[in-house]
Amino acid sequence: MNNFTLFLFSCLYFIGGNLKALVLGINTRPVVNSLKKLGFYVYSVSYYAPEDLNADEKYYLINPLVHGRLKENYDENKLIEIANKLADEVDCIFITSGVFEFENSKIPGWDNVIGNGPKKINEISNKYKTYKKLKNLGFNIPETKKINNKTQLYKFLEEFKTCILKPIYGSGGSILKIELNNFDDEIINEIKFPIIAQEYIRGKSFSANFIGNTFITFNKQIIIKGMYAGNLTPYINLPNKFVEIFGEVIESFELKGMSGIDFLIKDNGPYIVDINPRILGTYETIEMSASQNLAMVLLNNKYAKEIKPRKVYIKRILFAKEKIIANISKRDFIHDIPKKNAVIEKGEPIATVIAKENIKSIINSVYEECAEYEKRKEDRENI
């Protein structure tokens, strides 16, 4: 039995259900469920409330039976307000995506956060300042410009022909690709300036994951219509020199806990497109690949070197192809399961599939358990 395993067993013995944790973010399930396996009493403060969320106390924004649209219904301030009331009751706080990533985010002074705190997350979520710092430090980034109006955007497109548009604040999320020969006024008029424009670099998207200053793994990202839709972990066909480069980024930004760097490859070198200073979407695939409880490692970073992802896992977030009624059964490989008969809008997430093989057949089986809302409505009317 190695030292890491001994540490796990000793923690399980001493914790004994006495420690309390709070997990905060849009989707807290992976971290919550890891902490429950360690014996924690867990509070979940989130937007989503899947059926397989095992928290002791759940606070959520979504209507489990009528999901609506995330962009219209999400309210970061409500989550932070709830978390603030619980913060003093818990021993530790874990932060996932979707909070402290906006210009007007309220920044609490919590001193029990595991990893990067709200202030650090907010600082790095200012993409424009982060890109400027990366460039000043000598790291490769795509050519980037802050765009204040349609005229500036057109000039940028004249130079690069194709570009990627991103909001100034935020980490991860969706992006918009536009081209000079398809400069659509209808689309442009919907853009909220100022915005960031970047040169378009053709190629696959990757991420590098760290815990503290310890490199954990590379991942190949699955991007569908400009939106993160999953990943493959680990991805091993990348040079070790990339690890050194990204290690310098982690050190330069003084990042703690779990952090990720998204990048593309140009001229055989990495070009950084995002820094994510909080618990990542790859959390679960790393856990499965390494056969270790990642929450334990986040609680004690010195054991990060024991995390060795080996088995290849694929994660896919499934989105509704039309407005649907979901009736997804609980089974292996399926996560983030909605409440039975939940109505989910077109384009919104249905569930998450994580598997080593047969991923397509599993995905198809999930879609087969979803009925078209309009067809179901029509069937009811004909009864």
UniProtKB/Swiss-Prot annotation:
It comes from the Archaea. Its main location: membrane. The chain crosses the membrane at residues 6-26. Residues 131-303 form the ATP-grasp domain. It is found in: Membrane. The keyword Cell division does not apply. It is a single-pass membrane protein. GO terms for molecular function: ATP binding; coenzyme F420-2 alpha-glutamyl ligase activity; metal ion binding. Pfam families: ATP-grasp_3. Signal peptide: none annotated. One of its GO terms (cellular component) is cytoplasm. InterPro entries: ATP-grasp, ATP-grasp_PylC-type, UCP016817_carboligase. Keywords: Membrane, Transmembrane, Transmembrane helix. This is Uncharacterized protein MJ0776. It comes from Methanocaldococcus jannaschii (strain ATCC 43067 / DSM 2661 / JAL-1 / JCM 10045 / NBRC 100440) (Methanococcus jannaschii).
